């Protein structure tokens, strides 16, 4: 055992104990966070507009601060972008994290001196929890790669602007900098394909032990490595131990990854966003990610089924239930208030509070009232691959409302297979049965002869890569939308 790995184990045990302190005292921790946020922001423009000085309880907060999405909050954000002070949070932000927006245009999310450290701390703590639980720390002696956006930042009215992953690159702890890859120069390459090729060249002969990124882009990295080396990734990097990911559900990609690697590796799921680092997987045995309750973020929840009603009920952490699909609402020490993340989550545990991300409130299929969500299609696909074989590179699902020749409507699955199932009919049946098991409304529509069984359209290799290029969303933190309530994506796939 090296000194480095020995110290990592000791440090991990210390960090885990600190985490357990607030995890075991969740409701008071959240109440203190809300009180602190209100107190610090009461003299801001937003605080005065919403009478923060009159807020003394969660009920007061709900009355004074409505739920807003980015567009509704943008009048305040525009003033922050103009370098006005004390608008949403005291002073001015350190950065704007620019995001293309999952369901809308470009967003400028403020990052403050209070919020930024938590983004870095959470990523570190996720790794520490892994070490504390498993005792595995030898990976700290090898090289680590984080596939991320360019760290080159621009200035807008004196405030630095960039992608969150690029901003985070400026905060890599000194003790990781020697082990971290790729080089700064390579990380600054904007064109994703050029960047991947440069990363492959830099890393192919290194002792890579930790690899991190969004699964579809890490998959591309692995494929390029394999093209060059003609070896499984696990043989090329014999000490590769840990895959860290976020942004999309890993399960649809898992079988393909294990084939590329040639063996199983441990993984840690993260839930980072420009708006905050909300959760991470703290256990290799328990389902879900630990909700971060002591990171300057106050959480609220609205049942997804009621979210678009006239007056949806907001609840705080103490009233959530396991197995209910909630829209995530946050108020943060970066000046977001009653902010609709657009994400939906479900609790898998209440002691401690653990969640899984189930999708986006605007990403669903409900052309016939079925309200199928991302979690359901992803789990059904993972089960179909497990039972009927095949390897999936990427996919998306769209409704076919008006099929030709008078047949019943159906869900159309566009799947890019790396390896076809032996029997496509069996695969399609298994997939449809899996989706029916996930969603009773869909099952009722099938049994009631309103819908026919789903249909699979196999698309050639690189179809989704070409689609993402055509949309200007190739590489980095962008990901393919796995389902939609119209055929905009489906009709733009070219092959």
PLM region spans:
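Active-site glycine/GP-rich loop and adjacent strand/helix microenvironment
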Residues: 1-53, 61-68, 76-83, 167-495
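Active-site diphosphate/adenylate-binding microenvironment
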Residues: 28, 32-96, 108-114, 118, ...
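Conserved adenylation A10 loop of the ANL superfamily
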Residues: 96-109, 456
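Short small-residue beta-strand/loop micro-motif enriched in glycine and branched aliphatics
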Residues: 105-110, 363-367
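Conserved beta-strand scaffold positions in the cores of enzyme catalytic domains, especially
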Residues: 108, 144-146, 267, 456
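Long, hydrophobic, well-ordered secondary-structure blocks that form the structural core
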Residues: 110, 115-122, 243-244, 267, ...
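Extended alpha-helical, oligomerization-prone segments that build pores/tubes and scaffolds
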Residues: 123-124, 129-137, 142-144, 179-182, ...
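Conserved AMP-binding loop of ANL adenylate-forming enzymes
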Residues: 130-174
């Amino acid at each position: 055992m090296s000194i480095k790995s020995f110290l990592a184990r000791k440090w991990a045990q210390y960090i885990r104990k600190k985490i357990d302190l607030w995890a075991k005292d969740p409701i008071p921790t959240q109440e203190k966070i809300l009180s602190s946020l209100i107190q610090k922001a009461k003299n801001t423009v937003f605080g005065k507009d919403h009478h923060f000085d009159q807020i003394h309880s969660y009920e007061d907060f709900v009355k004074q601060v409505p739920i807003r999405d980015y567009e509704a909050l943008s009048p305040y954000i525009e003033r922050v972008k103009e370098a006005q002070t004390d608008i949403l949070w005291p002073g001015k932000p350190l950065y704007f994290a620019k995001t293309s927006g999952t369901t809308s245009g470009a967003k400028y999310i403020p990052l403050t001196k209070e919020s930024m450290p938590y983004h870095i701390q959470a990523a570190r703590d996720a790794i520490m929890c892994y070490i504390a639980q498993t005792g595995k720390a030898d990976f700290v002696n090898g090289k680590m790669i984080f596939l991320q956006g360019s760290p080159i930042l621009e200035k807008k009215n004196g405030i630095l602007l960039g992608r969150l992953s690029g901003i985070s690159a400026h905060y890599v702890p000194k003790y990781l900098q020697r082990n971290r890859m790729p080089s700064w120069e390579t990380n600054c390459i904007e064109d994703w394909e050029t960047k991947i090729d440069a990363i492959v060249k830099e890393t192919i002969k290194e002792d890579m032990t930790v690899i991190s990124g969004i699964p579809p882009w890490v998959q591309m990295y692995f494929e390029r490595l394999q093209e060059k080396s003609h070896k499984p990734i696990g043989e090329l990097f014999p000490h590769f131990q840990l895959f860290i990911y976020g942004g999309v559900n890993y399960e649809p990609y898992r079988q393909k990854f294990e084939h590329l690697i040639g063996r199983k590796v441990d993984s840690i799921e993260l839930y980072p966003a420009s708006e905050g680092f909300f959760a991470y997987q703290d256990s290799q045995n328990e389902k879900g990610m630990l909700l971060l309750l002591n990171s300057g973020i106050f959480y609220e929840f609205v049942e997804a089924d009621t979210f678009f009603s006239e007056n949806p009920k907001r609840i705080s952490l103490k009233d959530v239930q396991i197995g209910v699909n909630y829209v995530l609402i946050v108020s943060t020490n970066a000046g977001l208030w009653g902010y609709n993340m657009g994400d939906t989550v479900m609790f898998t545990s209440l002691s401690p509070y653990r969640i899984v991300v189930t999708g986006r409130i605007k990403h669903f299929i409900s052309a016939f009232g079925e309200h199928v969500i991302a979690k359901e299609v992803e789990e059904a696909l993972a089960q179909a691959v497990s039972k009927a074989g095949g390897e999936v590179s990427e996919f998306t699902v769209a409704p076919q409302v008006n099929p030709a020749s008078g047949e019943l409507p159906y869900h159309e699955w566009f799947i890019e297979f790396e390896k076809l199932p032996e029997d496509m009919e069996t695969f399609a049946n298994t997939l449809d049965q899996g989706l029916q098991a996930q969603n009773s409304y869909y099952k009722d529509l099938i049994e009631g002869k309103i819908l026919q069984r789903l249909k699979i359209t196999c698309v050639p290799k690189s179809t989704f890569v070409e689609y993402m290029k055509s949309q200007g969303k190739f590489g980095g933190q962008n990901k393919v939308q796995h389902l939609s309530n119209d055929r905009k994506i489906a009709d733009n796939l070219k092959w």
